[in-house]
């Protein structure tokens, strides 16, 4: 998945994200779902027959996971969910979603959340496509409103009250694929810039023959190789069953920095041509910024790693 995501993101990071997001929510079922849940929901997703989503982020709480307000109240054999979710990938195209909601408000905040499988066509759900995004426009993003949505108690994923910790586990695994998006986009910026600098003539010489140009291209190359090695190492740790979540956080953090850095230099090297739609680098420039925002902001990654160092 890491290699495929990287390669697709070299052309369009939105498409690369669609590969990452194709199983959003399934990770929760894989780690914490019952055998019945896995047999019912996962095979159709793997076959490409259904689409899932992870409905976690809310209008007033993104990185602040403990600030989510959506409620799930037990009522007989059901839970009734009410709340709003924001910036949900696959939100308008999914067949079902895993929703994070408060079930036990009297408990400490980290033990108050649970997760539920919610069919997307359930009565009380309204899904609205978010338009006008800066980048990753090939990826579906939506706001989802839940108003008295009923799901059976059998749709509880994992343990009641363990939703916060289950969500943290989800982020730990998906950060590697976000880092892979950063590799692909950054590599595309470098490749396109090298090509342009060989062809573009400035003061009678190829742009790439100037030392300042070489410095910019070389710095891009060094950062990309460092990011690739860090990300691949984190991916190998996941595949081996011994995940290094600290390394995943580092890779995700560095991916955002590297992508923004490379995209910015790519536009600079292209000059005015980098600012028009005819050239690819303007798209990569717009796409890059999201890598510092979703699946945990760059500040959140620093805070996570900093706490490890200080513990």
What are these regions (language model features)?
Residues 78, 82-127:
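A short core secondary-structure module
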Residues 67, 121-152:
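Flexible, small-/acidic-enriched active-site or ligand-binding loops
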Residues 48-56, 100:
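A short, Trp-centered hydrophobic/proline-enriched beta-strand micro-motif
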Residues 1-11, 15-20, 32-37, 44-49, ...:
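Alpha-helical interface subdomain recognition
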């Amino acid at each position: 998945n890491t290699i495929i995501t990287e390669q697709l993101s070299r052309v369009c990071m939105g498409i690369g994200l669609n590969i990452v997001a194709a199983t959003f929510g399934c990770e929760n079922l894989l780690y914490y779902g019952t055998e019945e849940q896995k047999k019912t929901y996962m095979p159709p997703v793997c076959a490409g027959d259904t689409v899932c989503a992870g409905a976690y982020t809310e209008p007033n709480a993104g990185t602040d996971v403990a600030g989510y307000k959506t409620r799930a109240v037990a009522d007989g054999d059901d839970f009734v969910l009410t709340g709003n979710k924001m910036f949900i990938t696959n939100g308008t195209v999914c067949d079902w979603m895993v929703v994070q909601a408060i079930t036990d408000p009297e408990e400490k905040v980290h033990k108050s959340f649970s997760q539920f499988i919610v069919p997307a066509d359930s009565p009380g759900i309204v899904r609205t496509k978010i338009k006008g995004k800066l980048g990753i426009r090939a990826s579906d993003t939506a706001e989802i409103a839940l108003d008295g949505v009923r799901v059976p108690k059998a749709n509880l994923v994992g343990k009641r009250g363990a939703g916060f910790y289950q969500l943290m586990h989800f982020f730990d695994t998906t950060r590697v694929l976000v880092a892979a998006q950063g590799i692909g986009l950054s590599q595309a910026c470098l490749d396109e810039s090298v090509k342009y600098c060989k062809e573009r003539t400035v003061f009678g010489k190829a742009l790439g023959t100037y030392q300042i140009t070489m410095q910019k291209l070389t710095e891009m190359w060094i950062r990309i190789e460092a990011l690739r090695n860090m990300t691949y190492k984190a991916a190998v740790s996941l595949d081996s069953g011994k995940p290094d979540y600290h390394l995943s956080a580092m890779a995700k953090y560095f991916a955002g920095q590297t992508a923004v850095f490379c995209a910015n230099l790519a536009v600079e090297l292209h000059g005015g041509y980098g600012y028009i739609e005819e050239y690819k680098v303007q798209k990569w420039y717009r796409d890059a910024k999201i890598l510092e925002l979703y699946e945990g902001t760059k500040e959140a990654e620093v805070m996570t790693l900093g706490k490890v160092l200080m513990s």
